[in-house]
């Protein structure tokens, strides 16, 4: 069994596991990890095949969730950003007793656009998969630029994301393709109607990957969940609005 890279920081009485997005690694949380580790016992994770978690091929969402759970605390708040939001959601569905609260950040239960469902056009995701085999570093950089577009700090936010990617060896092409396949095919809209733990959904108003139109649709589908939109953020609100972001998580801690 390959080990997942896992770092624990802080002494808080509540555990908080942070799961990053596609193409990235746990270094993406460095802008908020000091602040959060003063409130939580913080767990920083490189998803299987990403960052320092080497030796994994492309995994299904279920296998990725199970691999992460092997090293996780017995009970924690699980926070997932983008693709990581699907992994955290899968864990909440299959092991609810391990999840004190679920937090998804700039994530969708169904990233791919479907009938009457806003999302990323399937041909865009397929295009990324095609381009990965041609020039995968450039493809990943394009994807990162998409994530910060439109914000006041877009250029520096994109630089921060790029630095995170370049800090560690690039994931294998099949791992990146496997992640895109999850984004293209997974649909957790109906299953997540049944989760009963506190469920907080955070969005960026300017997000080009998770359209804000999904927010009221999910408010209606999941009335037990809460949503919050960062008015001037895009796909990475914890980078553009770190203080506000941490404040919301500390407030959630008081309620679980």
UniProtKB/Swiss-Prot annotation:
- Predominant location of this chain? cytoplasm
Keywords for this protein? Biotin biosynthesis, Cytoplasm, Hydrolase, Serine esterase
Q: Which residues form the active site?
A: 82, 207, 235
The record, for Gene3D superfamilies, names: alpha/beta hydrolase
Pathway connected to this protein: Cofactor biosynthesis; biotin biosynthesis
Q: What is the catalytic activity of this protein? A: 6-carboxyhexanoyl-[ACP] methyl ester + H2O = 6-carboxyhexanoyl-[ACP] + methanol + H(+)
Cited function? The physiological role of BioH is to remove the methyl group introduced by BioC when the pimeloyl moiety is complete. It allows to synthesize pimeloyl-ACP via the fatty acid synthetic pathway through the hydrolysis of the ester bonds of pimeloyl-ACP esters.
What family does the Swiss-Prot or TrEMBL record give for this protein?
Belongs to the AB hydrolase superfamily. Carboxylesterase BioH family.
Q: This chain belongs to which protein, by name? A: Pimeloyl-[acyl-carrier protein] methyl ester esterase
Query: What is the organism field in this record?
Result: Escherichia coli O9:H4 (strain HS)
